[in-house]
Amino acid sequence: MTTQANASVRVEILAREDCPNRGMALVVVERVVDETGIPAEIEVVEVASDEDAEEHRALGSPTVLVDGRDVDPDPLYSDYSADDRIYKTHRGPSGWPEPEWIRDALLRAVAHTTSNGTH
């Protein structure tokens, strides 16, 4: 789990402990947060079962949420699950989301926070 002080955006990586793409999802999220300079709290949330997945709104492992919203603009799945997740990216199938999706989600979250006067 990684956090930054004065976080304004919440980023959750929902994943099983044994998920083969959990580590790479975290690396990509941290890299995008660093590149954008957007203050964010990054948390890895254990999703051990389909019940956990439903509770946390995970469409597979790993799922990346920014302020509670999936970063994938066009998810392949609609059911909550702790199974491995495949993302449809411009590179082809991938086990983690595109950095651009994470960046766009962070920018939307900041714009939403600012427009609501809560920033």
Region roles according to the model:
Residues 1-41, 45-59, 63-119:
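Non-globular targeting/processing and membrane-anchoring segments
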